[in-house]
């Protein structure tokens, strides 16, 4: 049927997207954990987890074929529910990144300063990964970043931009 053709395609392409996200997250984590620890003065711990709607047991080492098989299986299990609601209930578009600070979900329990520190950590980590991949330093744009940072975090940010081109408003 037409639905099976679509499910095969979304499983194939979705598995590649998920695999690439998992691999990227593994690289990003290496930088993010270090930066977050430094920016918080060693007082806070950051954990990043890829929350997949396909399977809870995925990581960067999971083969893409296994992800694709899990995806197909999940689509088969959800087939009647998806037909009722008229949309896909699982896949890369439904996945999320869990940001955990000191053992608690950042979206619910982190202070504004911790959330801001996490956001800065992502920006700095992304810049480092881009530099490693492309060999070029990206331009970093930071809007209203200093207003919610304490003096220690402000100093850290300024001192750790290195030779990057940064615009702060």
Residue ranges and their predicted role:
Residues 2-139, 148-152, 156-160, 165:
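Conserved NTPase motor "head" modules and their coupling/switch loops across ABC/AAA+ ATPases, GTPases
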Residues 143-145:
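Walker B catalytic acidic pair
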């Amino acid at each position: 049927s037409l639905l099976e053709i679509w499910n095969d395609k979304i499983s194939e392409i979705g598995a590649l997207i998920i695999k690439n996200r998992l691999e990227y997250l593994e690289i990003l984590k290496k930088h993010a954990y270090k930066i977050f620890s430094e920016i918080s003065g060693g007082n806070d711990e950051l954990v990043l987890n890829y929350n997949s709607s396909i399977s809870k047991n995925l990581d960067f080492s999971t083969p893409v074929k296994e992800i694709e098989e899990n995806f197909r299986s999940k689509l088969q299990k959800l087939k009647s529910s998806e037909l009722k609601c008229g949309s896909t209930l699982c896949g890369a578009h439904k996945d999320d990144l869990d940001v955990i600070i000191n053992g608690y979900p950042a979206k619910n329990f982190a202070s504004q300063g911790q959330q801001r520190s996490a956001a800065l950590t992502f920006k700095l980590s992304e810049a480092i990964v881009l530099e490693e991949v492309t060999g070029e330093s990206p331009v970093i744009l930071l809007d209203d970043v200093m207003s919610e940072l304490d003096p220690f975090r402000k100093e850290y940010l300024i001192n750790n931009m290195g030779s990057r081109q940064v615009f702060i408003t």
